């Protein structure tokens, strides 16, 4: 599905977006939340809303890499978890609630294709802290569903502040936000 509006990160520095379309990043972010969702964003309520409305970096292969805004500077720049490349094409995302099993089903399918049955094995899982904050109690529901559908003997892992993974076997590793990354952990 095409994004509602595409923007350019016209000035960046690591994980800091200085300007979007040649304007202060925070000003643009405020306007997007106001016009698209009716949210009056301020520096005081920034993080309470930002966790639910991350930026998406649009890639040439139609993938979207999530970047959660975490801080605003006095100069109007916005810090995100993860690097924002210069001139990246951005869009504003609305983080979904539990996605009716799509994420878990996709993980189960990928693991099965790579390793066969996961029954009685250990699944190493890295769960994004931002995803946990956004979903609230839904995060536990998602993990219980993952454990049940993979039929693993043990679900182990950590809450993480960014996940490294790829979207295809032997693909280039990328830093992700709001992700659930899993792998078979041999005994």
Locations of the language-model features?
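Small-residue-enriched flexible segments
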Residues: 1-136, 140-153, 158-187
């Amino acid at each position: 599905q095409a994004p509602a509006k595409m923007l350019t990160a016209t000035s960046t520095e690591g994980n800091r977006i200085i300007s979007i379309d040649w304007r202060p990043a925070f000003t643009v972010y405020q306007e997007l939340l106001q016009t698209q969702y009716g949210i009056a964003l301020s520096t005081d309520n920034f993080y309470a809303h930002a966790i639910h409305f991350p930026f998406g970096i649009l890639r040439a292969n139609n993938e979207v890499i999530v970047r959660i805004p975490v801080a605003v500077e006095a100069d109007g720049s916005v810090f995100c978890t993860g690097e924002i490349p210069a001139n990246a094409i951005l869009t504003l995302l609305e983080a979904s609630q539990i996605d009716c099993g799509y994420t878990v089903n996709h993980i189960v399918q990928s693991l099965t294709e790579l390793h066969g049955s996961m029954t009685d094995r250990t699944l190493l899982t890295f769960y994004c802290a931002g995803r946990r904050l956004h979903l609230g109690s839904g995060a536990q529901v998602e993990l219980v569903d993952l454990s049940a559908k993979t039929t693993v003997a043990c679900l182990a892992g950590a809450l993480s502040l960014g996940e490294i993974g790829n979207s295809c076997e032997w693909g280039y590793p990328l830093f992700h936000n709001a992700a659930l990354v899993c792998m078979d952990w041999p005994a």
